Amino acid sequence: KTQGAINVTCFGAFLVAQEASKRMLKRKSGSIFFTGASASVKGFANSSVFAMGKFGLRGLAQSLARELHPQNIHIGHFIIDGAIGREPFGTYETINPDPIAKTYLEFHNQDKSAWSWEIELRTSVEKF
């Protein structure tokens, strides 16, 4: 069970990044995005396996950013701190997927003079 969770939350991302970066390096451009969770930066009781994978994913993204940013490959890690869904307007209990997608696109289009490698997204009512 533990190995399967690590494979899903971390190792699969490594394999995808490995293959995608080969192609992007040939083109000398591209973006690779990883979706994390609040467990990427803090552990919770009864979620150690999930945290292991998400911490690993964040470390992978950070390492790849340092390795590939100078080669014009933009690496992004997105911490989604909350449930994703479409709540009625104004309730802010879940993170609407449309603004998430907009944030990913804006990240992809960042000016090269001001690239970031990580963004946290949460609702305005989420405690952190």
Residue positions per predicted region:
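Catalytic Tyr-X3-Lys loop
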Residues: 1-14, 33, 57
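C-terminal helical subdomain
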Residues: 70-128
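Short-chain dehydrogenase/reductase
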Residues: 6, 10, 46-55, 93-95
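Short, well-ordered secondary-structure micro-motifs
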Residues: 17-18, 44-46, 88-89
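Structural signature of the Rossmann-like NAD(P)-dependent dehydrogenase/reductase core
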Residues: 9, 31-37, 74-77
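Amphipathic alpha-helical dimer-interface segment in Rossmann-like NAD(P)H-dependent oxidoreductases
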Residues: 8-26
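Catalytic loop of short-chain dehydrogenase/reductase
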Residues: 25, 31-56, 62, 66-69, ...
